Regions:
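C-terminal cap/linker of serine protease catalytic domains
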Residues: 93-110, 174-196
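Serine endopeptidase catalytic core focused on the charge-relay Asp
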Residues: 25, 32-141, 163-165, 169
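Mature hydrolase/peptidase catalytic cores and their serpin-fold inhibitory cores, especially
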Residues: 136, 146-148, 194-196
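Active-site-adjacent loops and short helices of periplasmic peptidoglycan-processing enzymes
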Residues: 16-30
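Catalytic nucleophile loop of clan PA
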Residues: 152-172
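Secretory targeting and sorting signals
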Residues: 1-18
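Contiguous, well-folded functional domains in the mature portion of proteins
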Residues: 84, 104, 149-155
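Short, solvent-exposed secondary-structure boundary/capping segments
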Residues: 88-91, 144-152
């Protein structure tokens, strides 16, 4: 314990500044334009060295301010800078002075990018509304590039990362059907599947 304290005290002012940054990772709740709740898909550094993240495009568009749900009192930590409505993804540029990117957020880890899951594979998601849930992969969705999975999703889970064996395979886009029951309790899988 003494060794740990000595190491921590030797870190200096830069470590103290880093500790003030908001930890953000896949599954973190985000607030867009002060009133829309969604979920961060993932976060990392792009080829230009910018700290960026992804969420669903229907959460907001370019220019929208993004705050961390867990630290709304700190104000905006990023801005939506690009997106694609057809593929339903948005790019967020984060302020590295305000955000500390993490690969594991609330116990949900993303260790890389994976291939499209096959029928029957178990996929898991972490959303700001319904938390963590896992379910079977049914197969391709109606729209190109989508997959249907039996994971729990509610409003606010849009953008939630979906993984197979801790590898990112997609994000929550919406519900498979408005004519089927929605997910009320993640432990009861009798609900409409999610479209990823």
């Amino acid at each position: 314990m003494v060794c740990v304290l000595l190491v921590l005290t030797g870190l200096g002012a830069n470590a103290a500044a880093a500790d003030e940054r908001v930890p953000m990772g896949g599954g973190a709740g985000i607030v867009i334009s002060g009133d829309t709740m969604c979920t961060l898909t993932t976060i990392g550094t792009d080829a230009a060295g910018d700290l960026i993240g992804f969420t669903s495009a229907h959460c907001g568009g370019p220019g929208a301010q993004v705050a961390a749900e867990a630290a709304q009192n700190r104000g905006p930590v990023g801005t939506m800078v690009a997106g694609n409505d057809k593929l339903d993804y948005a790019v967020i540029k984060f302020d590295p002075a305000k955000v500390a990117p993490v690969a594991s957020y609330n116990g949900f880890s993303i260790e890389g990018i994976g291939p499209d899951p096959a029928f029957g594979q178990i996929a898991c998601k972490q959303g700001r509304t319904t938390g963590n849930s896992c379910g079977v992969t049914w197969g391709p969705g109606q729209d190109p590039g989508t997959i249907v999975m039996q994971v729990c999703g509610q409003p606010g889970d849009s953008g939630a990362p979906v993984t197979v064996n801790n590898l990112l395979v997609g994000m929550i886009h919406g519900a498979f059907s408005d004519n089927l029951p929605t997910c009320i309790i993640k432990y009861i899988p009798l609900h409409t599947p999610a479209v990823v």
